[in-house]
C-alpha cells in the first residue's frame, strides 16, 4: 500500500532497517505547560513493547480503577520505548508506588487538567536505522528536500494496522454500508503469523460464528464482542455498533488517511508544488512551527503572491483533503485532483454523513509537508541515529521512508 506512493526526492535511498529492537525507536511526548494547572494527578509513563491502550488497561486493573478514568493525550508505537503522560483524577499515588508491571514504569510529575486525545504539541524522536547501505547520500537527500520544502506528510502504516493492514478496507466497506463484507475483513483477514490467524482463516472459509467463538483467542475481545452481538441480533451492522466509538472511528479515519495519501502522491506525480500554493488551494495557518489545521483560507488569483510570501516565512502551509461531509473543498487544479481521488474510489463526501452517528466524520485539512524541527543525525559504521521533533499527528516513519526509500 505505502510502497505505491511517490517519493518527493529523486536521490536514491540509504536503505536500512528500523525497529529491529524497541530501543531503536524512542518517542518522548511533549505537552503544553498549561496542562499543569488543575487537581488531577499527572504521571509520566515509560513503556516498552506495549500498546498505549493495553498498558493503560493493565495499570487501571492493578490499581483498582476503570481504565476510562485514566486520561492520555496520544497513542504511541508498540514496538518502541515511549514516554507519555497520563492523568488520574483521584489519589492513587500509594497504589502506583507499589505497581510492578513488566516494561511499564510510572513517575508522578505533578497536578494538572485531565488529559484528552490531542492535548499534546508533538513528539520528540530518537531513531536508530541499522544495516544502512549508503549513508553518504543523507546530505544530498536532506538538501533536495530542503529545496522542496520538507518531507511528504503521508500517514504511516500504523494508521492502517501494522500487523494487519485492513483498517482502511473495513472503513470503505462501512462507508458503503456493506457491513457483512466489512465484518469478513475485520474478523477473517489473517495477520502475518499472528496468534489467532488460523481461527480467522477458518471463519473466512466457513462463516461459522459459533465455531469462531470457540476458536478466537480471548485477547481478541473486540472481535469476540462482535461475534456475540451478531449471534444475538443476526445483524452485522448491530455487531459493529457494539464496538467502542474510538474503535469505530479508527476504521473511518484509516480510509480518510488512505485517500489523503493518494491525493498527496498524485500531486507529486503531476509535478504540482507542495511548498507553494496555486489558485484553488486551501492553506492552513502555522504558529510557532505548529500547523493550525482548523484555521484555513482559500488561495485565489488575487491573493496567491501574498499567500506564498506567508508560506516562505513559515506562517502557512499548503494542505490536502481529509474527506468528510463538511470538509473545505479545494478549487481549480487541486479541486480536480480531489474529485478524481473520490471518483476513482467510488465514494462521495455525503457518505460520511450517512454513517451511523458514532462513525460520522466531518473531515478537514492536513498539511502536505512535514517540517521536522531540531533535525540531526549521527553516522556510526552501518548505523545512523536520527533525532527530530514532529507536531502531533505526523509520522516519524514517513520521514524515514523518504530517507531510506522503503
From Swiss-Prot:
Give the matching NCBIfam families.
tRNA_TruD_broad (TIGR00094)
Ranked from the top, the taxonomy reads: Archaea, Methanobacteriati, Methanobacteriota, Thermococci, Thermococcales
Gene Ontology molecular function, alphabetical: RNA binding; tRNA pseudouridine(13) synthase activity
Keyword presence, rRNA-binding = no
- Pfam families (UniProt xref): TruD (PF01142)
User: Which segments constitute the TRUD domain?
Assistant: 150-371
Would you tell me the protein name for this molecule? Answer: Probable tRNA pseudouridine synthase D
Signal peptide range:
none
State the InterPro entries in the record. Answer: PsdUridine_synth_cat_dom_sf, PsdUridine_synth_TruD, PsdUridine_synth_TruD_CS, PsdUridine_synth_TruD_insert, TruD_catalytic
User: What role does this protein play?
Assistant: Could be responsible for synthesis of pseudouridine from uracil-13 in transfer RNAs.
The domain of life for this entry's organism is Archaea
One GO biological process this protein is involved in is:
tRNA pseudouridine synthesis
Species of origin: Pyrococcus abyssi (strain GE5 / Orsay)
Assigned protein family: Belongs to the pseudouridine synthase TruD family.
Query: Which residues are catalytic?
Result: 77
Disulfide pairs here are none
Q: Where are the transmembrane segments?
A: none
This enzyme catalyses: uridine(13) in tRNA = pseudouridine(13) in tRNA
| EC number, UniProt record | 5.4.99.27
* Keywords in alphabetical order: Isomerase, tRNA processing
